[in-house]
Amino acid sequence: VILLSKNNSFIKGAAILSIAGIIVKILGAIYRIPLANIIKDEGMGYYQTAYPFYVLLLTISTSGFPVAIAKLVSEKRALGDHRSAYRVFKVALTGLTIGGLLSSLFVLFMAEDIVRSIDNINAYYSLVALVPALFFVPIMAAFRGFFQGRKNMVPTALSQIGEQFLRVVVGLSLTYYLLDRGIPVAAGGASFGGSAGAILGTVIIFIIFLLHKESIEREVRQTRIQTDYSVGEIIKDLLTIAVPITIGAAIIPTMDTIDAGLVIRRLQSIGYSKETANELYGQLKGFAQTLINLPQVFSVAIGMSLVPAIADANARRNKREIRQIIGSGIRMTLLIGLPCVFGLFVLAKPIINLLYFKNTIETINSSGEILAYLSFGVIFLTLVQALTAMLQGLGKPLIPVINLFIGALLKIILTYILTAIPGINIKGAAISTVVAYATAAILDLILLSKVAKIKFNYRDIFIKPLISALGMAIIVRFSYGFLLKIIGGRLSTILSIGIGGLAYVILLIVTGTITEEDIKFIPKGERLGRYLDKFKLLK
């Protein structure tokens, strides 16, 4: 078992971003669940058709740069070169502002052609409404990368919360207001919430930057190291890191963009109408995929903290610290991801019924089946995110790109084949997604162990969390069946989730998966640790 220092900035950063992520996901649930109940699977189909293309453009213009900025800033600061660290940020901010302007203008003038190319003209309003976000998100990304490189995760956390809050308020308000004008227009109102949130998130992090600017510039003035880190060198270093990451990050939204057209067309090829195919796609992306994305709040937070932490240790050539961080990151990812997999699988239909109860029984049953298949993708998706961050921090960004590309190719092939089989239909897209992430995660893990020269403690990192999660799933299944007979309905689902969470924590302690050192990291952890140790519950 890897012991973690209380002063470990990686853990602290991950905790801050996880808390922010939980708040963001709660707000997201407040947004997506009533949204799906308002515009139904038809509207979610339009919304989700536009969204992957928007994410693709944002990925191209921003995804690799926050990581590149964080890595370079962290490395320069580790060497005491604050002047170069600040120069990296200023050059990146200029480039991202230009990139955001170009991508927003591209969508503004090409929106109609884009939606026609994927044979869904009703998604036009949903796409155009996201144009302002395409400009502001890259700017926000530059500031977030800079603060993350300084190992200050608070500005990112606050801007995330502000961004999501306004997205919810504006998105739901416009959806209600525009509903009388038709589902396509209402879906466009929902999309505009993303633009409103991006503007507020940018404003928040810019204000925080202004508050820190004096101390940042003081650091620069006090820097004794004199280096000629030119603009050309900065651009070269940024692109060297960012381009492979951007290519890798673009694979998933590209995959989703292809899905938007491929899935609907393949469903039509076996007799589904365009409307029904769109509704099934809405169930996949708007209902099931939304729930699959919830555990990512933790893996994304872990990943964002891993890059600067590993880059810092790598710059100091501290191999032991690198191995400790990697082991901790994988273990944390599995501890969170595994119970989500089995919980979503066991309670797939009850959870869909709990959240999307205003939809028809047919929609709830169909979405539940999709979620059951898709649930197994949670652990592989969260692992891919964490392992990708580790390889990026080690200066090997191309490895996860190649592995994810292999997975994406498998997904496209399997989606094409499986979705056109009548007995499988839309579930084929879910199965292919799981296979894609499983392939990428396994390849990442194998190559990471070689790059970092690390031998994993499989019993503590993999086996113990798996046993605890399986035990939890069995308890949840029997609890739900028992409660359903007594109280029925959605309350039994809520209580079963609570019982499952409690059972998982107990099983983690009983199996020795959670140690006394781990307990110390939670509030009042030392007192709790002594209490549990008194009853011989900690190992």
Predicted segments with their positions:
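Membrane-proximal transmembrane or re-entrant/amphipathic helices at the cytosolic face
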Residues: 478-539
